Amino acid sequence: RKGYIDGRSARLMTVTVRPGKPNGAASSFFSGIIREPLAGEPSVCPVSPDVSHPVTSAGATVDGLITVFECSREAYGGRTALNLPGLNVTVQEMLDALERVAGPEVRARVTFERNETIAGIVSRWPKGSSSVRANKLGLFAEKTFDDIIRQYIADCQAGPNAAQALKGYKA
């Protein structure tokens, strides 16, 4: 308040596709509907295909946090949190991207089975976001969800577990 501390806060969008095993978080399916099919595993989506939510890649999130940390107070432009950029997509758009990038066999590994608890939680989340202040810092969301999937695949291919993580994907 008095300017003695230069504190900053950034709101993160849902990071998709997150590596690793599925977890109990309500948002876990956003990664699971991409990660598991690419690994040759089935995935159950607990919400309807028309659910919309802002997502981003792990790399864009890390870049955003570094930029917020390193920018000047003037460039940061305020004392309140800023939204890091996110791509506003529906679950259906995510699955369409999966099919374009990895093919219909991979996409077919995703089925829908509504989970009322998760659907109820997700229904109260933002359907989209804007990031005007982050854009002024040179941060922008990925242009398409295809880009996010391709980045996840590239990250997996460079990692030690590529064979396991991508066993259901043929380039």
Which residues does each PLM region occupy?
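NAD(P)-dependent short-chain dehydrogenase/reductase
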Residues: 1-51, 58
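Amphipathic terminal alpha-helices
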Residues: 131-135, 143-171
